[in-house]
UniProtKB/Swiss-Prot annotation:
Tree of life domain: Eukaryota
PROSITE patterns assigned: ADH_ZINC
Lineage of origin: Eukaryota, Fungi, Dikarya, Ascomycota, Pezizomycotina
Chain positions recorded as substrate binding sites: 49
Family: Belongs to the zinc-containing alcohol dehydrogenase family.
Name of the protein in question: Medium chain reductase/dehydrogenase ucsI
Names of the cofactor(s): Zn(2+)
Free-text remark on how the cofactor is bound: Binds 1 zinc ion per subunit.
EC number: 1.-.-.-
Single Gene Ontology MF annotation: oxidoreductase activity
UniProt keyword annotations, A-Z: Metal-binding, NAD, Oxidoreductase, Zinc
Amino acid sequence: MSPTDMKAVVFYGPHSIAIESRPIPKVQHDKDIVVKVSASGLCGSDLHYFRGHEVVDSAGFIMGHEFVGEVVEAGRAVTTVRPGDKVVSPFTVSCGDCFYCKLQNSSRCVHCQVFGSNGLDGAQAEYVRVPLADSTVVRAPPGLSDDALILMADIFPTGFFGARNAMAGLGAQDPTEAVVVVIGCGPVGLCAIVSALEYRPRVVFAIDSVDSRLGLAEKLGARPLDLKKGVPSIISAVQEVTEGRGADAVVEVVGQGPALRTAYDIIRPFGSISSIGAHHSAMPFSATDGYE
């Protein structure tokens, strides 16, 4: 491999990836940077591509949309970082100036690009190009390991976003009196639990069918509910502590219809469901169900 090439994980279609030599990316526009990757995460949405659950128009792109690394090249218009800085990147590129960015909805930026997609190569490679760097990457605080920093690229912010949205739906209710449920205790679900606990709710239930995940959730401070015992037992446990009303807020982190249906079954009237799982099937309840 020459000094102008790098190794990269390339997606060619469902169940078809390859490690290949690709040219090291260069700055193409004044607001670009190039990052030497030191850590790159594997997201559940990468598995959606791999398993064929999410169809792409064309393949041959480098995967990976959450990463940490060192800036090695910067365009002349970049002002917030410079070569030598360690940075953390979210999964999308954003401009910082459009309608959505100003509302802090940067994932819907009018100039949005997703790393690891047809439009923009990702970071499961030795180097990655980052457009619109000033409004996309964040300089990493000193003293944190790559293992800690990589959580802040996508995993923790997604869990935090889900918990924050669920708690925002409480309205006038005191958060410390709320009963919160997190469905799914994988990495993002555990981060949602940590985030929900910051609101000091009366109880946070954690639902999963994997014993080790339930154990981690319990260590964090959640009350585990084992899905293997059946949904009726979960409904009963939630109703027992809410005088039969149901949960005040639910964060659904699985991305499957049955999980979203469980959220619907355990939420109280006027409760808040925050669904951050990546869904590929029809809604498991109707508008009529919601009205009733």
